[in-house]
């Protein structure tokens, strides 16, 4: 018997890119035996997003008149249903939607001389994860991406367009090295 997975989002369609540039070789590390970049691509497909190549001309993305989902392969286990929820929120609000995680580390302010000052309230802080979903109107209003660093991109977009954040589940966390990949692998073991 053939098993068919349901497409989670297929309203009017959306395009998606796995943004691997500027991330070194880490997108090709293995999690559960698969490259992080492959895991990210599968999540886009399962969310009903049509994947396009990072090299697709920006003008073609504008002409498509569809939302654009940017997915970071360093958040490889972001669930498809979360990506679909971000696309749905983008369609409902016409705002840029950014996946975020709470900051759990203790943060300290440092003065100009490098002297540690006060503890920063981490409740007000969020770590940008994945995805970032751009409504078609925002895609049309840009000449391209200002950055492929998601934190920088989110800040740039927030300065120019309405932005809504959605809290990503724990498995949507960002990895920064092979040790983080092992932690994520343990977190998502089935």
What spans do the regions from the language model cover?
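N-terminal glycine-rich phosphate-binding loop and ensuing alpha1 helix
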Residues: 1-56
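N-terminal membrane-targeting/anchoring modules of bacterial envelope and secretion proteins
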Residues: 1-4, 26, 61-62, 146, ...
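Flexible, charged surface loops at secondary-structure boundaries
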Residues: 7-13, 61-64, 90-93, 158-160, ...
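Residue-level signal for inorganic ion chemistry
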Residues: 37, 71-72, 102, 135, ...
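Short phosphate-binding loop-to-helix
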Residues: 45-69, 76, 82-88
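Glycine-rich "substrate-gating" loop/helix at the edge of Rossmann-like oxidoreductase active sites
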Residues: 74, 170-173
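Conserved core of the sugar-phosphate nucleotidyltransferase
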Residues: 77-168
């Amino acid at each position: 018997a053939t098993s068919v997975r349901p497409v989670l989002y297929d309203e009017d369609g959306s395009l998606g890119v796995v943004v691997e540039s500027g991330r070194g070789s880490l997108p090709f590390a293995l999690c559960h035996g698969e490259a992080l970049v492959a895991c990210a691509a599968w999540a886009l497909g399962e969310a009903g997003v049509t994947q396009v190549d990072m090299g697709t001309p920006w003008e073609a993305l504008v002409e498509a008149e569809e939302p654009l989902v940017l997915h970071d392969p360093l958040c490889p286990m972001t669930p498809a249903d979360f990506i679909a929820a971000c696309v749905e929120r983008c369609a409902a609000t016409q705002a840029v939607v950014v996946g975020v995680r709470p900051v759990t580390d203790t943060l300290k302010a440092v003065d100009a001389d490098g002297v540690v000052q006060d503890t920063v309230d981490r409740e007000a802080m969020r770590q940008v994860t994945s995805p970032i979903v751009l409504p078609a109107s925002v895609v049309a209003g840009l000449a391209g991406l200002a950055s492929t660093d998601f934190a920088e991109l989110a800040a740039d977009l927030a300065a120019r367009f309405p932005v809504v954040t959605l809290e990503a589940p724990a498995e949507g966390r960002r990895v920064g090295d092979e040790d983080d990949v092992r932690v994520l692998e343990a977190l998502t073991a089935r």
